[in-house]
Swiss-Prot record:
It comes from the Bacteria. This is DNA mismatch repair protein MutL. Pfam families: DNA_mis_repair, HATPase_c_3, MutL_C. CDD domains: HATPase_MutL-MLH-PMS-like, MutL_Trans. The gene is mutL. One of its GO terms (molecular function) is ATP hydrolysis activity. It comes from Chlamydia trachomatis serovar L2 (strain ATCC VR-902B / DSM 19102 / 434/Bu). Belongs to the DNA mismatch repair MutL/HexB family. Transmembrane segments: none annotated. This protein is involved in the repair of mismatches in DNA. It is required for dam-dependent methyl-directed DNA mismatch repair. May act as a 'molecular matchmaker', a protein that promotes the formation of a stable complex between two or more DNA-binding proteins in an ATP-dependent manner without itself being part of a final effector complex. GO terms for biological process: mismatch repair. HAMAP family: DNA_mis_repair (MF_00149). Keywords: DNA damage, DNA repair. One of its GO terms (cellular component) is mismatch repair complex.
Length: 576
């Protein structure tokens, strides 16, 4: 029977904790976060995590921290029981992760929990907790430290269960959380066992650079700019991704303030402003930045999960960031200028034109790159693209007009056929061709694929690589053959034509990233979304326009699959 709205009652402790859990515990990753932060605050330097069912079946966190005496366990299960602060003012000088004393009772109120703990020289105890209350406590010897096992998460709050995402999404959230923990906490060893398989292992002796390479890949570290700048009590340390390394979302950005993973639109904006002239619009740089600020400048008590931060003295922080980033980018710019000045000019042949154009090409990559026309590339065995009619109504494609390249005007080309002169928008045209070659079953045409004699490799996070591994057959059906050469990288055996190697690699990483993030989305929709965001016009090879013939074989469409303009006939009215 419902209570009268006019009567005011005190809520029981279980209900209070369950309400609090709704704020603090969003999903299984939230539980892992709170438990490992307890381990870190307890001084642990070895933390072992095990999860089943994406964490909803079981979460076990084992550490070698200071541990607890048996009589401390029931106290730790009460709300606002903490060893971190005594007064509100202490929040602004915190060096610990937790301070509210809400996490453990909140988790215990929506799960079945077991705590096995011992202090140095202590006997050790094991406590069973159900619905937030200890039901059994017995002596249980163990070495110094604590093991907390959480079973059947949300078992007694079915409404919360119905709002949970898939176990795969939970695993993704846990992986990102643990990757951030690996980056933020040097001197700590980490092991994560997911579904009885080791997903992550980092020795405590591994340094910051090794950890960045583990999380973001060795290729990121090799191309990134290292920064380390200090002004008084302020310091910024980390890696800024090369301008060639950018993504369609901010997922590649890792920010830590005083070793706490946080989000800050202010800092993200400052970094983006520094890259504005180097990367395409609506793309985001990759970075790993660690800021060390006076604790009284940071308010982490903004969000229950402490993922947001309010900052004081933004002007000083901005000055430090701008100077550090500018110095790093200027160092790279200077080194590139020196390389360019040392490279002699050479002539690039233009197929079927009989003329040559001087070009300066800096040798800034490990393997020599050349700029011949597409059909002359020595590292590709390219089959001439063929158009296969799937319907008698499309038989008109067999009559193909000749198209002649006239000139390039930056992002557009002028070409000529029997109808007249056309303006072709390079980005939209090449994007459309790539899309046709991927999803031709939807468009009645199919373009042949190119096979790499020396397969390039592409690197990503292990979770993203696992997503691609599950989609290898679907990718092969699209003409992309990948072979896994390490836990976090693939070799590209073959791919659709008319896309440069770096663009192809960028698209594969984007597909893996989007697929890992949006588990419920169809593969075809993921392909379409990521192709739409891909930038084709950047660093296009000079006079490599063999793809124009294919565009004309497709009937010289005026608009791309997403409605973007591909070409327009130049009319007399344009000159009046």
């Amino acid at each position: 029977m419902s209570l009268s709205p006019s009567r005011i009652r005190l809520l029981d402790s279980v209900t209070v904790n369950q309400i609090s859990a709704g704020e603090v515990i969003e999903n299984a990753a939230s539980v892992v976060k709170e438990l490992i932060e307890n381990s870190l605050d307890a001084g642990a330097d070895e933390i072992h995590i095990e999860t089943l069912g994406g964490g909803r079946g079981q979460i076990v966190v084992r550490d070698n921290g200071v541990g607890m005496d048996p009589e401390e366990v029931p106290v730790a299960l009460q709300r606002h029981a903490t060893s971190k602060i005594a007064h509100f003012a202490d929040i602004f000088s915190l060096a610990s992760y937790g301070f509210r004393g809400e996490a453990l009772p909140s988790i215990a109120s929506i799960s079945k929990m077991e705590i096995h703990t011992a202090r140095a020289g202590g006997l050790g105890s094991k406590t069973l907790i159900e619905k937030g209350e200890p039901v059994c406590c017995e002596p249980a010897p163990r070495q110094q430290g604590t093991t907390i096992a959480v079973h059947s998460l949300f078992y007694n709050v079915p409404m919360r269960q119905s709002f949970q995402k898939s176990p795969q999404m939970d695993r993704l959230a846990i992986r990102r959380l643990l990757e951030n923990s690996v980056l933020s906490s040097e001197g700590i060893g980490w092991t994560w066992i997911s579904e009885r398989r080791q997903e992550l292992h980092v020795a405590k002796k591994q340094g910051f650079i090794e950890r960045v390479a583990l999380v973001l890949g060795e290729s990121f570290v090799q191309e990134a700019f290292f920064i380390d700048k200090q002004q008084g009590d302020l310091r910024v340390l980390g890696f800024l991704g090369s301008p060639n390394q950018h993504r369609s979302t901010r997922q590649g950005q890792r920010l830590f303030i005083n070793n706490r993973a946080v989000e800050s639109s202010f800092i993200s904006k400052k970094v983006a402003e520094a890259y504005a002239w180097m990367i395409p619009a609506q793309r985001y740089p990759i970075f790993v930045l660690k800021l060390f600020l006076p604790p009284m400048w940071c308010d982490f008590n903004v969000h229950p999960q402490k993922t947001e931060v309010r900052l004081l003295q933004e002007g000083q922080i901005s000055n430090l960031l701008v100077e550090a980033i500018s110095e790093a980018l200027l160092r790279r710019s200077s080194s590139l200028e020196e390389i360019v000045l040392k490279v002699p000019t050479e002539k690039i042949p233009i197929e079927n034109e009989g003329i040559s154009v001087p070009s300066i090409r800096p040798a800034i990559v490990s393997a020599p790159l050349s700029c011949p026309t597409f059909s002359q590339q020595p590292y590709l065995k390219t089959e001439m693209a063929t158009i296969v009619s799937r319907d008698s109504a499309s038989s008109s494609l067999s009559v193909v007009e000749k198209v002649r390249f006239l000139t390039s005007l930056g992002k557009v080309l002028l070409v000529e056929d029997s109808e007249g002169v056309h303006v072709v928008f390079v980005q939209a045209a090449r994007k459309h061709l790539f899309y046709v070659s991927l999803l031709s079953e939807r468009l009645e045409s199919r373009l042949a694929c190119q096979t790499f004699l020396l397969p390039p490799s592409v690197q990503m996070t292990k979770l993203e690589a696992d997503f691609l591994q599950m989609r290898l057959e679907a990718l092969t059906a699209l003409g992309i053959e990948l072979s896994r050469i390490s836990p976090d990288s693939f070799a590209i055996e073959s791919a659709p034509p008319f896309i440069q190697e770096e663009e192809l690699k960028e698209w594969i990483v984007a597909l893996a990233q989007e697929g890992a993030l949006h588990v419920g989305e169809s593969f075809e929709q993921l392909v379409e979304n990521t192709v739409q965001k891909l930038v084709f016009s950047r660093n296009a090879r000079a006079f490599d326009y063999a793809w124009l013939d294919i565009l004309w074989k497709l009937g010289k469409p005026e608009k791309a699959f997403d409605g973007e303009m591909i070409r327009r006939l130049v009319l007399d009215d344009d000159f009046m």
